[in-house]
Amino acid sequence: MSRLRRAGRSGWPVAGGDCHSLGGVTNDYIKTGSPIYARSFEIIREEANLGRFPEDVEPVVVRMIHAAADPAIADLIAFTPGVAAAALNALEAGAPILCDASMVATGIIRSRLPEHTRIICHIKDPRLPAIAEAKGCTKTAAAVDLWQEDGLLNGAVVAIGNAPTALFRVLEVIHEYFVD
């Protein structure tokens, strides 16, 4: 990568311009949060293939890339036209955000949501291990069934992070309950 430089005798790669080493450890780096945060998004916009995304979807894609730390995932992201407006409308109408993993729920910036938005993640629900075992599935897939049983799924915003079985189960439930 063009942004990497070698530091000191150890040759460890470090980000930034000219690196000064102190026994192989660089002291030339951004040291405060705000500039690091801003530069991260600049790098994403420089390196990711964002041109095919509509204006309302692009910020979501940029956040996904930031979370994954991989600009190449932009080429793997699919979207339905109108998805951003539909999600915003759902949230403004009081829909919850259903998350497969605590990491996803924690990463949601609550200050950017309508005030009473519920963020729901059942992964620590004590019922899940038994439900998953009885159904022969993962806990995250069983959590999707709990969302449906509790009447949460219809109209919700679903955020899937690192549990593909949750995504597959969401698609199955949508097909089973919501598609004619």
What annotation goes with each model-predicted range?
Residues I108-H116, E172-F178:
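Short, solvent-exposed amphipathic alpha-helical segments in soluble enzyme
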Residues G23-L98:
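Electropositive, gly/pro-rich neighborhoods at or near active sites that engage anionic ligands
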Residues T140, G151-L153, I160-F178:
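Glycine-rich phosphate-binding loops that contact phosphosugars or nucleotide phosphates
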